[in-house]
From Swiss-Prot:
The lineage of its organism: Bacteria, Pseudomonadati, Pseudomonadota, Gammaproteobacteria, Enterobacterales. InterPro entries: CheY-like_superfamily (IPR011006), OmpR/PhoB-type_DNA-bd (IPR001867), Sig_transdc_resp-reg_receiver (IPR001789), WalR-like (IPR039420), WH-like_DNA-bd_sf (IPR036388). GO terms for biological process: positive regulation of DNA-templated transcription; regulation of DNA-templated transcription. It comes from the Bacteria. This is Transcriptional regulatory protein PhoP. The gene is phoP. Residues 2-116 form the Response regulatory domain.
Length: 223
């Protein structure tokens, strides 16, 4: 699961990121609405945790804007506003749940997991672009109903490309997903992984579906 944490407090944002990563999830952390918009469009998170007190845009405004643009992912709000009127406003804006500050991170984790369980019955766990199919729960790629054996990194790349079908995904974006720690990133690693992934796909589907867009990144597109 990929989680987007939108929180301007650097220390709290770090603690949330560490806890969520320790639970086995991928995390993108944004300090403001502008950065949150970038991660929303580039990485397509499964759930967002949003603080209302952002420096460049009120969190409620951000949530309303996302919902008006048909962004349907579950949203958990962090807020210091405690009145029932404030809570009604949060939910009316489009949030699915909220946690009031101060809070224990364990409560945030529990509510996040509850939202994902609730949402799993509504959201499709399969991305289907015949003959390609990605099973999000099993983390498997199938071509013509044949499961392709991929490493964890190869699967992450494939899922990202298919989620962005018809759109160029930058190498930097892929690197960030594979290696959250900047010290571990090496640009040639993506080239090696992409080469292996292409070979595995072409063994089942000879037509080229992943192309390199020079100076921009990679594109998955069925022709």
């Amino acid at each position: 699961m990929r989680v987007l944490v939108v929180e301007d407090n650097a220390l709290l944002r770090h603690h949330l990121k560490v806890q969520i990563q320790d639970a086995g999830h991928q995390v993108d952390d944004a300090e403001d609405a502008k950065e949150a918009d970038y991660y929303l469009n580039e990485h397509i998170p499964d759930i967002a945790i949003v603080d209302l007190g952002l420096p460049d845009e009120d969190g409620l405004s951000l949530i309303r804007r996302w919902r008006s643009n048909d962004v349907s992912l579950p949203i958990l709000v962090l807020t210091a506003r405690e009145s029932w009127q404030d809570k009604v406003e949060v939910l009316s804006a489009g949030a699915d749940d909220y946690v009031t500050k101060p809070f224990h991170i364990e409560e945030v984790m529990a509510r996040m997991q509850a939202l994902m369980r609730r949402n799993s019955g509504l959201a499709s766990q399969v991305i289907s672009l015949p003959p390609f199919q990605v099973d999000l729960s099993r983390r498997e790629l199938s071509i013509n109903d044949e499961v392709i054996k991929l490493t964890a990194f190869e699967y992450t790349i494939m899922e990202t490309l298919i989620r962005n079908n018809g759109k160029v995904v930058s190498k930097d974006s892929l690197m960030l997903q594979l290696y959250p720690d900047a010290e571990l990133r090496e640009s040639h690693t993506i080239d090696v992984l992409m080469g292996r992934l292409r070979k595995k796909i072409q063994a089942q589907y000879p037509q080229e579906v992943i192309t390199t867009v020079r100076g921009q990144g990679y594109l998955f597109e069925l022709r």
